[in-house]
């Protein structure tokens, strides 16, 4: 019986070694699949990100042109108003200076009102 026990024990040890190899291969395969899945997910994320960035740039380009035109129009209006104000200032400059000098150098006695 000793030989049978020894053969049985040896058979169990061989089966255990074989099971260990199978488990190890399964772990390696699972690890490999997890890495592959992670890499695939990264690629999908990058592709999605690139697509959304392209869509955003297209949207931005379409809408920036309208804003740019409005901004240019506003700038033109502002410059026109500035020119008008400068022209009005230049036109009345002499009279304003005369009035200021007259007011400063010509005393006019006025009674101080009690507050």
Swiss-Prot record:
Compartmental location: Vacuole membrane
Keywords: Hydrogen ion transport, Ion transport, Membrane, Transport, Vacuole
Domain of life according to the entry: Eukaryota
Pfam families: V-ATPase_G (PF03179)
GO cellular component, one term: vacuolar proton-transporting V-type ATPase, V1 domain
UniProt-recorded Gene Ontology molecular function terms: ATP hydrolysis activity; proton-transporting ATPase activity, rotational mechanism
Protein topology in the membrane: Peripheral membrane protein
PANTHER family, per the entry: V-TYPE PROTON ATPASE SUBUNIT G (PTHR12713:SF11), VACUOLAR ATP SYNTHASE SUBUNIT G (PTHR12713)
Function, as annotated: Subunit of the V1 complex of vacuolar(H+)-ATPase (V-ATPase), a multisubunit enzyme composed of a peripheral complex (V1) that hydrolyzes ATP and a membrane integral complex (V0) that translocates protons. V-ATPase is responsible for acidifying and maintaining the pH of intracellular compartments.
Family per similarity comment: Belongs to the V-ATPase G subunit family.
Subunit structure as annotated in this protein's UniProt entry: V-ATPase is a heteromultimeric enzyme composed of a peripheral catalytic V1 complex (components A to H) attached to an integral membrane V0 proton pore complex (components: a, c, c', c'', d, e, f and VOA1).
NCBIfam families: V_ATP_synt_G
Protein name: V-type proton ATPase subunit G
Organism: Neurospora crassa (strain ATCC 24698 / 74-OR23-1A / CBS 708.71 / DSM 1257 / FGSC 987)
């Amino acid at each position: 019986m000793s030989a049978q026990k020894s053969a049985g024990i040896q058979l169990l040890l061989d089966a255990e070694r074989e099971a260990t190899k199978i488990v190890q291969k399964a772990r390696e395969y699972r690890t490999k699949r997890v890495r592959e899945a992670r890499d695939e997910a990264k690629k999908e994320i990058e592709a999605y990100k690139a697509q959304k960035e392209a869509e955003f740039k297209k949207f931005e380009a379409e809408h920036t042109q309208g804003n740019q035109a409005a901004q240019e129009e506003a700038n033109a209006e502002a410059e026109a108003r500035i020119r008008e104000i400068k022209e009005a200032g230049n036109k009345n400059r002499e009279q304003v200076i005369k009035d200021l000098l007259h007011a400063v150098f010509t005393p006019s006695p006025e009674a101080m009102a009690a507050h």
